[in-house]
Amino acid sequence: MAVESRVTQEEIKKEPEKPIDREKTCPLLLRVFTTNNGRHHRMDEFSRGNVPSSELQIYTWMDATLKELTSLVKEVYPEARKKGTHFNFAIVFTDVKRPGYRVKEIGSTMSGRKGTDDSMTLQSQKFQIGDYLDIAITPPNRAPPPSGRMRPY
């Protein structure tokens, strides 16, 4: 006699993020690379042990939100504090199938405006210690380049 399992989508629950006690948990070193032209760095800029020169080193936790990271970047770059400045976040990680790196856009924030991605965390986007964060900063007087996530098809 065969037994058939029927699992519905409702029964497959996402594991909730466990809250991180920042008093007891050691922070991680987040290596952040920024551009101010609205485009992410090319992947070849991360090849052979090299990284772009625009590096920020931030000590933070896996539950850091994009809004929190935006605030930290604005502390370092006063020109990014202008209302309407757009921050597009991407994780740069080692490609396990071939030599080099891959990029995964994860969300965006805007200075002076609340957005749907503000509360997104590194942990929720499968960030792993050792990955890089690439932030494309677009000044308020220029429209950000279209991202793959916003395509109508």
UniProtKB/Swiss-Prot annotation:
One of its GO terms (biological process) is mRNA processing. Its main location: nucleus. One of its GO terms (cellular component) is nuclear body. Residues 7-20 have a biased composition (Basic and acidic residues). Residues 93-153 are annotated as: Involved in splicing regulation activity. Keywords: Acetylation, Cytoplasm, Isopeptide bond, mRNA processing, mRNA splicing, Nucleus, Repressor, Transcription, Transcription regulation, Ubl conjugation. Residues 1-20 are annotated as: Disordered. GO terms for molecular function: RNA binding; transcription corepressor activity. It is found in: Nucleus; Cytoplasm; Nucleus speckle. Ubiquitous. There is a cross-link at K13 (Glycyl lysine isopeptide (Lys-Gly) (interchain with G-Cter in SUMO2)). The modification N-acetylalanine is found at A2. Belongs to the SAP18 family. This is Histone deacetylase complex subunit SAP18. It comes from Homo sapiens (Human).
